Design a protein with these regions (language model features):
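Asp-based, Mg2+/Mn2+-dependent phosphohydrolase catalytic module
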Residues: 2-20, 27-46, 61-81, 85-286
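Canonical radical SAM enzyme core domain
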Residues: 56-60
Length: 286
């Protein structure tokens, strides 16, 4: 049964490593959460290691710059591991061919360029008709578009049998008060249209393996933290590690209106419907 806690400090002594989600836990895309930052700093001061693990489609250097601009200090984390990092390696390995149709915003171009990997030179972005595969980092304009805007183009690509690499398995994200679609929503549509989608972020294994390599750990007392039941919590369950579900993020509307602490009965009913049982739940990371 999921235990509701009031702070990370209540259980911190039981863990050596945190895999902590960023968006919805440490910031909301516009502002950082000071209490979450303080909790991570305290964990590290106690000797723990923190990997900020995000399904952002961009390499870690771009994400580091983003969170620095939001005033997330470097002493709150040991490393940043992104879905983009894991997916980038797969793309450079030729998993979806060398000539790819890129679906995503200009801000995501670092996915193709921000790397010392010499294999990057072999990847060429081309028009859909010339592509051997599809690389989705997001929507072209996530502020105004929905997956429905891509139905025709993705249907054609799926009909040609093009594999699709999804650089961000998230379906939606909250940007301030606005909910936006992510690359995962397009990959989901692609599969519904009969296409093949490849995933590398949470809840899939490659991003956890990469995080462990970067932290220099090989299992043990690990704890995952996140507000995505189908990504953060599902990933923790698949990895066989404990988790904290942050209920004041994506699932806040189902928890009784109090983002600081979920209502016990509502949480239990919702988790039962989702078919997942995180070890702990907390309103906001603190």
């Amino acid at each position: 049964m999921t235990r509701i806690i009031d702070s990370l400090a209540e259980i911190a002594q039981d863990y050596d490593v945190l895999f902590c989600d960023l968006w919805g836990c440490v910031h909301n895309g516009k502002v950082a959460y000071p209490a979450a930052i303080a909790a991570l700093q305290d964990f590290r001061r106690g000797g723990g290691k923190v990997a900020l693990m995000t399904n952002a489609p961009r390499p870690r250097r771009a994400v580091a710059a983003q969170i620095a601009a939001l005033d997330v200090p470097e002493d709150a984390w040991d490393d940043i591991v992104t879905s983009g990092d894991a997916a980038q390696d797969a793309m450079f390995s030729g998993r979806v061919g060398r000539r790819v149709w890129h679906v995503g915003a200009e801000k995501d171009l670092s996915f193709f360029t921000d790397t010392p990997d010499p294999r990057a030179a072999a990847i060429t972005r081309v028009a859909p008709a010339e592509a051997e595969g599809v690389v989705v980092t997001g929507l072209f304009d996530d502020m105004t578009e929905t997956p429905a805007d891509y139905h025709a183009a993705l249907s054609e690509a799926a009909g040609r049998g093009l594999p699709l690499l999804c650089a961000n398995p998230d379906i939606v994200v909250d940007f301030g008060e606005q909910r936006l679609y992510c690359a995962g929503a397009l990959a989901q549509l692609y599969e519904q249209l009969g296409g093949e989608a490849l995933y590398f972020g949470k809840p899939h294994a490659p991003i956890y393996d990469l995080a462990r390599r970067r932290l220099g750990v090989s299992g043990g007392r690990e704890l995952a933290i996140g507000d995505g039941i189908g990504t953060d919590i599902a990933g923790a369950v698949a990895q066989g590690i404990d988790s904290i579900f942050v209920t004041g993020g994506l699932a806040a509307e189902h928890m009784g209106g109090n983002v600081e602490r979920p209502e016990d009965a509502l949480l239990a009913d919702w988790l039962k419907a989702e078919g997942l049982a995180p070890t702990y739940a907390i309103g906001r990371l603190r």
